[in-house]
Structure formats: structure tokens, C-alpha cells
Amino acid sequence: MKIKDHIGTYIKLEISGNKLISGILIDIGSDLWVIYNGYDYLYIPTVHIQNWKFPKEEEIDEIITLSDDQSPIFNPNEEISLRKTLTAAKGIFTEIYVTSKQAIHGYIISIMNNYFVFYSPIYKTMFISLNHLKWLIPYTNNQRPYGLSNANLPVNPSNITFARSFEVQIEKLVGTLIVFNMGENENAMGKITGIKNNFIELTTAKGNPLFLNLQHIKTVHMT
């Protein structure tokens, strides 16, 4: 079966983290699928699609029609990809989903080799591993997060210079108080002491050393 022959068909997917998504299959690229769920266009990296199916008509419990008020941000004449989509979303209010707890709202500032820099009005400057991005939703109707005005959303929210790789960027934060993975594990916050053999040494609030596997770091933000 050629999956691209089914563009425009209702589909159900399971994403990493036991998340279920259903909607209309809009496009498929080299490393990205686009689904319209009746409200938003979701851009889902292929690597996080655990399984999918085209349900039978009697299994579909919703009717989804494409909206004239919204359109995807990709060029229909080009093959879509995650990097192209992130680039197109720069400066657009965007929702991203990384951890199992909640979505993050804000703006993509910069796209590096294996991570991107994201500004959230709540968490401020964040570093997001591309390997752990489950999906993103760029909003194309001039929405602003939390009803904030442009004056409350700094164009250059950080004076930090960004390293090309996620690993080197974390190394630059040695001696800094940080929170990993949005605090989903209360132990994953403290002061970075160093990085060695793909493990981050963290000093916890009680002064104890804790070693975190770099490959399992999804997000980083400073306190």
C-alpha cells in the first residue's frame, strides 16, 4: 500500500508517550506527517509514530472538514520535512509537545543541528531536543499566547549565544541552575557540574550528585 495514495483519508495514529491522534491525513514528507484534527494542523515527526490505521467507517465517530480559515504552512510544491517546517514556523506562535505532561506555547527562535531554541512566556528561553519533539502546531491566524501583546513578547528574549549542538549547549551551562524535561522528574533540576561519557552531573538542592543520561534530556530551561 502506498500511504501517499490515501492523503485526504481519516487516520488514527499512536504517538510515543501513548498519545492518540486522529484526523485527516494532509501530507507525508521525508520525516514528517501532517494531520488535520478538525481544529489544528499537527506536524508529527515520523520517528514518533508508533502505529497507525485507517479505521472502518463505522469506527469513525467524528466528521472533520477542512477549514477555509486555516491552511498548512508548507509549500505544496515541495516535499515537506521537519527542518523545513521548523524554519517556516520561526516567529509564528507555535504549540509544541515534548514531554508526557503538557504542551508548551511560544515561538521558535533558532534551529540548530540537533535541537532548537524556543521562547515561552512561561518558561522563557528553552532548548528542545529534536529527537524528542513529538509534534508541533504552528498557528497561522495571528494568535498570541496567553493573550499577550507584542510588547510583552521580546523579539530577542535571550542574550545567550547558541552552540550548534545540544550537547555543547548544555556544556555551556555548567555552573548554572537549570530544569530538565520541564521538571517532570523532581530530581532533574539543580546545578550542572559537568558532562562526561554522555552523562550530565547535576548537584541537587541537598548538594548530592546526580547523573543524567544525555540521550534522555528532552528540554532544558534556566531558573
Where are the model-predicted features located?
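Short glycine-rich, low-complexity segments
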Residues: 1-105, 109-189, 193-223
